[in-house]
């Protein structure tokens, strides 16, 4: 009986393995994307989470490279960040469901008009999950270690593909 069950289990495993695509496509986040951060609706425990700021977006060019089982989407074009402590270039690693970018940097805590910013160590993790329509949606969480802005800041993020202009003579 035990041999029969083992044989059935082995056949079932072979059946499932045989139904998987032989050369499944590797994930890719390449091309121009408008990356939007929904700062106006951010949340968290930090003083910074309650300071109003508008949503903001910039267009970035991403390029994906894969080696073995690891795929990384790197920002290869776009505006430089205002905060010089942000690691450059930004690199997002595919975790099987989302593009994830963990990094350490210095948060620049705004202390009001005319007052110097207070800098503090911070750790962020941004993730973007591909959607069926080609967009990516996710969240950006920052944990600020110390200072007047100590605590968390969490905001929704999204990336929208930027369509290239029509080619000359394409009739579009």
For each feature predicted by the language model, list its residue ranges.
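Internal, hydrophobic beta-strand segments that form the core of beta-sheet-rich folds
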Residues: 118-145
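Beta-strand elements of well-folded, non-transmembrane domains
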Residues: 37-41, 64-66, 79, 142-144, ...
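Edge beta-strand at a domain terminus
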Residues: 137-172
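Short, cysteine-centered beta-strand-loop-beta hairpins and adjacent loop/turn segments enriched
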Residues: 39-51, 81-84, 108-117, 143-152
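Tryptophan-anchored aromatic micro-motifs
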Residues: 25-50, 79, 136-140
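Secretory targeting and sorting signals
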Residues: 1-24
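Predominantly extracellular/secreted and cell-surface proteins with exposed
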Residues: 53-123
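A short, structured loop/turn motif at beta-sheet edges
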Residues: 25-32, 63-70, 92-99, 127-136, ...
């Amino acid at each position: 009986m035990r041999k029969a069950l083992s044989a059935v289990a082995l056949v079932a495993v072979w059946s499932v393995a045989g139904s998987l695509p032989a050369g499944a496509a590797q994930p890719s986040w390449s091309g121009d994307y408008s990356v939007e951060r929904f700062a106006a609706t951010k949340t968290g425990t930090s003083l910074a989470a309650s300071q109003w700021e508008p949503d903001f977006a910039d267009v970035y060019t991403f390029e994906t490279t894969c080696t073995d089982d690891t795929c990384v989407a790197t920002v290869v074009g776009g505006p430089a960040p205002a905060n010089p402590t942000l690691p450059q270039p930004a690199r997002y690693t595919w975790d099987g469901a989302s593009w994830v970018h963990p990094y350490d940097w210095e948060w620049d805590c705004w202390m009001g008009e005319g007052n110097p910013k207070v800098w503090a160590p911070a750790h962020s993790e941004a993730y973007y999950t591909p959607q069926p329509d080609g967009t990516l949606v996710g969240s950006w969480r920052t944990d600020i270690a110390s200072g007047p802005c100590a605590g968390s800041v969490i905001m929704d993020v999204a990336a929208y593909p930027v369509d290239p202009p029509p080619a000359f003579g394409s009739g579009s």
